[in-house]
Amino acid sequence: MPSTFPGLLLDHAARRPSAPALREKEFGIWQTLTWGELAVLVRAIACGLVEAGLARGQHLVVIGENRPRLYASMLAAQALGAIPVPLYQDAAAAEFVFPMGNAEVGFAIVEDQEQVDKMLEVRASCPQLARIWFDDPRGLRHYGETGLAPLDALIAAGRAYDAQHPGFFAAEVAKTRPADVAAMFYTSGTTGHPKGVVHTHETLIDRAAAGARFDKLTADDEVLAYLPPAWIGQNIFSYAQWLVCGYVVNCPESASTVTIDLKEIGPTYYFAPPRVFEGLLTSVMIRMEDAGRIKRWLFDRAMALARRIGPARMDGRPVGAIDGLRYALGDLLIYAPLRNTLGFSRVRVAYTAGEAIGPDLFTFYRSIGINLKQLYGSTETAVFV
């Protein structure tokens, strides 16, 4: 297995160029980007960045929701030996000043007008920020600030540079070593200024591969990427493990469509903080309160059985034959439809982290056949301890 993220990308592109790598929902329709297409896009962005002046060891800020071209931008920076720095898209402009000054960031690729406005505001305190590119041009037609341009322009410049220097991209990827810095993540800064945590290709790939082996992840898995890319947990599940395993990462249309998109995609590998699992359970209980008496009675009986033997079944412990038959009937009538309603019909492995999850909540999901596990980790340990 290649030992750097750009190396992993090129390996997938060579072995399975037509396999889906990323999907993005746009105007209600899922658009697919294959590994071959992704490699071509990364090559163009990388060549555009070097033509713009990004050098090995310099930092590139990436801000936005989970978007294929932002993922490609991170890969492009890594291919050049530069260091992507994802920052939280919901942060105020003032919150960007410290990390961007601390990392001496001179280049930024952002999602849309909201993030462009923040970068222009930040420039007063971070004069080294020379170039800003944006993915979504809506609302930005009349912006004429120096150094501001659409990502499409960067890609076009990169293609021209690549045509003049055809061996450049491959040579840069070959220079990148496992011990080189792959990304910098900033902590929340609850006790002071945020701390920049540096991870190499080696550390991130090692943690991602270890988790993939433990959970038996393969290229056939599907992930829904909806948490902030600046959080290292999201980066591990939807970036590092994605490149290690070669599975498909699905990017929702917006935060408001995540629940719908979850049901449409039916991910096999899922991560969410406890509040998401709590919200889903609350919605189920509210719906059952409005259900008819017979349906409520069936649900209560089935859940009583599930709480009694479901966790044992999930842990592989034996249960009685009669209880097993009852559970199978409950799965047919209650548990499987419930998993489908939640969007968990295909989930093999589900994780939660960030805070402790209540035992009742934990028991509920494992009782109905969802392999939910508590994850302990930190930014410094690349999620997994």
Which residues does each PLM region occupy?
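A short helix-loop-beta submotif of the ANL/AMP-binding
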Residues: 46, 59, 65-85, 89-93, ...
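Conserved pre-ATP/AMP-binding loop-to-beta segment of ANL
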Residues: 17-20, 134, 152, 159-186, ...
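Conserved AMP-binding/adenylate-forming core of the ANL superfamily
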Residues: 22-67, 71-75, 92-97, 150-155, ...
